[in-house]
Amino acid sequence: MKIAVLPGDGIGTEIVAEAVKVLNALDLKLEMETALVGGAAYEAFGHPLPDATLKLAKEADAVLFGAVGDWKYDKLDRPLRPEQAILGLRKNLGLFANFRPAICYEQLVDASSLKPELIAGLDILIIRELTGDIYFGQPRGRRTATDGHFPGAEEAFDTMRYSRPEIERIAHVAFQAARKRSKRVTSVDKANVLETFQFWRDVLTEVGQQYPDVELDHMYVDNAAMQLVRAPKKFDVVVTGNLFGDILSDEAAMLTGSIGMLPSASLNASSQGLYEPSHGSAPDIAGKGVANPLATILSAAMMLRFSLNQEVAAQRIEAAVKDVLVQGLRTADIFSTGTTRVSTVEMGAAVVKALK
């Protein structure tokens, strides 16, 4: 089982190091090779995704990714910015399905900004289509307007589009995931305004007929955003497009009290995947030893489950994370009165010790 380890920038190196320690403690036959990506790769090779890094990722069974980005690269040409590395990996590996779980651990209920009764026991899985929608639709650009409200004015434009195969494959992923949970799927769209998402709704409904044991309901994105705050536990599996998924998954993440707790997975058709924490590179706290490694450690658990077929090992990691929370150990982002504040390295060591 070959893993490409890409720590990246900022706190990425710190949190990935702890996840690697946890993986090494499992006594599995894992072959892990590390490479530069993002700003670190730009500094060394002049590009955020060097050919050698991409080759390593393509040949691996899975990629364990930290985070990329730093304010000092914001003035670079867009293709050279660190964030382009993750887009390049998604494209070259064909990663079309993004899994973003939002789980509220019992010990962290008070960390949420919502009332405890609203989020206690929360367990949502947001499945976001990653390769289509307005982020990648063509044409796009800037031009002089020839019509609209202000002909002759400078304007910018993007294209929202989805093909039937793109929608069908993400729909199957969602229904199959729901079968392993509570057999409920909520498809989020804007079918009342956008032709693209009326088509999305039609195709989801058609695919849903192949899964008579799974309940499907549709919800407009504005209502979904509201219901995530009003009654989040009404959701189980949520499937949506790239743009809406980008927004809703971050909203759901904050329901739990800390984005530092939330893993993510991006998979292709052959279950090769890229696994990363939901948070960014946080250059403001890099090197201070205060970053929360649990999202990355839980991402490693997802990697074992979805790409490496190691369910027992995945459960061991998840149980160990719960154990350290029960012990009252907290990094700065989830620290509260009555708990014990620990560093990044100390939290990683505690998870290793808690493995059973």
UniProtKB/Swiss-Prot annotation:
The record's top EC class is oxidoreductase
- Which GO molecular function annotations are given, in alphabetical order? 3-isopropylmalate dehydrogenase activity; magnesium ion binding; NAD binding
Amino-acid biosynthesis as a keyword?
yes
Residues binding Mg(2+) are: D222, D246, D250
Q: Does the keyword NAD apply?
A: yes
The EC number(s) this enzyme carries:
1.1.1.85
Cofactor binding remark = Binds 1 Mg(2+) or Mn(2+) ion per subunit.
Cofactors required:
Mg(2+); Mn(2+)
The UniProt catalytic activity note for this protein reads: (2R,3S)-3-isopropylmalate + NAD(+) = 4-methyl-2-oxopentanoate + CO2 + NADH
- Output one GO BP term: L-leucine biosynthetic process
Record-listed NAD(+) binding positions: G280, S281, A282, P283, D284, I285, A286, G287, K288, G289, V290, A291, N292
A Pfam short name:
Iso_dh
Give the InterPro entries listed for this entry.
IsoCit/isopropylmalate_DH_CS, IsoPropMal-DH-like_dom, Isopropylmalate_DH
Q: In which pathway does it act?
A: Amino-acid biosynthesis; L-leucine biosynthesis; L-leucine from 3-methyl-2-oxobutanoate: step 3/4
* Record-annotated site: Important for catalysis: Y135, K190
Its keywords, alphabetically, are: Amino-acid biosynthesis, Branched-chain amino acid biosynthesis, Cytoplasm, Leucine biosynthesis, Magnesium, Manganese, Metal-binding, NAD, Oxidoreductase
Q: Give the protein family.
A: Belongs to the isocitrate and isopropylmalate dehydrogenases family. LeuB type 1 subfamily.
Q: State how it assembles.
A: Homodimer.
Report the NCBIfam families cross-referenced here: leuB
Role description:
Catalyzes the oxidation of 3-carboxy-2-hydroxy-4-methylpentanoate (3-isopropylmalate) to 3-carboxy-4-methyl-2-oxopentanoate. The product decarboxylates to 4-methyl-2 oxopentanoate.
State the name under which the record lists this protein.
Answer: 3-isopropylmalate dehydrogenase
